[in-house]
Amino acid sequence: MEVMRILHMNKGNGETSYAKNSIVQSNIISLGRRVMDEALKKLMIRNSEILSFGIADLGCSSGPNSLLSISNIVETIQNLCHDLDRPVPELSLSLNDLPSNDFNYIFASLPEFYDRVKKRDNNYESLGFEHGSGGPCFVSAVPGSFYGRLFPRRSLHFVHSSSSLHWLSQVPCGEVNKKDGVVITADLDNRGKIYLSKTSPKSAHKVYALQFQTDFSVFLRSRSEELVPGGRMVLSFLGRSSPDPTTEESCYQWELLAQALMSLAKEGIIEEENIDAFNAPYYAASPEELKMAIEKEGSFSIDRLEISPVDWEGGSISDDSYDIVRFKPEALASGRRVAKTIRAVVEPMLEPTFGQKVMDELFERYAKLVGEYVYVSSPRYTIVIVSLLRMG
């Protein structure tokens, strides 16, 4: 599976598009807002004389959320500058995602974004910016994988990423051996599943964890080159609170999708061997795994590390004993909404293996499975939010 080509959300504005089914990701951005605002305040106080800030949002995707993060960042900086009685610095805002992302949707949304910036900035016209421009904000798109360098050395002051770092750079390979100096890899043995599960072999657990450590270390090393000393980074993504990578919070949405696929295979609609060959380029990391990677890379210190549970529709959960009693029709309706959210994200990576023609039937079955599960359980995701300081 070529992740660079297939890892993008459903494009456009249709009923199965990411633009219409991304409330969970929007809520995750909101969940990390407090930590982001705190990091920006510390950054602004330390850099009171800087006239221009480099800011990047990594994994921006497309749709209404694509400009939400940088809009929040600009709003926070404007408010901080007002409180600190200083002019708003020029802001170089870079939006990053893979080349397959629908950047045209983002470009079409920029005039509305610029208008919001203008309304919030009383100094807009006095700075010499014309109507229709971005004012002190200069927005650009940077296509490419964030598992590698994207920006010039020491050109960034702040990096943000939400709902992206749970995606891996590639599907993990099987056990790696050396024979006569040649590295040999095998396909991952995870039959009947598309991600880690209770029945996955321990070797699958190992290679998934290793792939995350490799990818996240490359991510940190790349950002350490691009951020100025004292720069900050706030990351939020799907993770887990348990050391066990096969708990419900980290994998059960994939387990139910595998069940839906297997039901199609049993009826001869798709080939079971295609299910055996498919594994999601995804990993829900634990806080301990994050700490290990950050400490090993050595360029960043952890300013804050939090985990927050949300339900499968993105709603906040404030109580550890969270439990909702649902009527059956309500649970099935919830299942349909969850299925549309998942479809908007994973359909582009499923189509090359299973074909476009089966997608409607697949996600109808998936919606029913999710609804039945929601009826008897209260499933949740765990959101990891980490704020990092570039040392030096």
Swiss-Prot record:
One of its GO terms (molecular function) is metal ion binding. Specifically expressed to the flower base. Localizes specifically to both the lateral and median nectaries of flowers (at protein level). SUPFAM superfamilies: S-adenosyl-L-methionine-dependent methyltransferases. Belongs to the methyltransferase superfamily. Type-7 methyltransferase family. One of its GO terms (biological process) is fatty acid biosynthetic process. Catalyzes the methylation of jasmonate into methyljasmonate, a plant volatile that acts as an important cellular regulator mediating diverse developmental processes and defense responses. Pathway: Lipid metabolism; oxylipin biosynthesis. The lineage of its organism: Eukaryota, Viridiplantae, Streptophyta, Embryophyta, Tracheophyta. Keywords: Cytoplasm, Fatty acid biosynthesis, Fatty acid metabolism, Lipid biosynthesis, Lipid metabolism, Magnesium, Metal-binding, Methyltransferase, Nucleus, Oxylipin biosynthesis, S-adenosyl-L-methionine, Transferase. Binds 1 Mg(2+) ion per subunit. It is found in: Cytoplasm; Nucleus. One of its GO terms (cellular component) is cytoplasm. Coiled coil: none annotated. It is an enzyme of class 2 (transferase). This is Jasmonate O-methyltransferase. It comes from the Eukaryota. S-adenosyl-L-homocysteine binds at Y18, C60, N65, D97, L98, S145, F146. It catalyses: jasmonate + S-adenosyl-L-methionine = methyl (-)-jasmonate + S-adenosyl-L-homocysteine. Jasmonate binds at Q25, H166, W167. Transmembrane segments: none annotated. Mg(2+) binds at N190, D276, F278, N279. It holds the Pfam family Methyltransf_7. Its main location: cytoplasm. Its cofactor is Mg(2+). The record marks H160, L238 as: Involved in substrate discrimination.
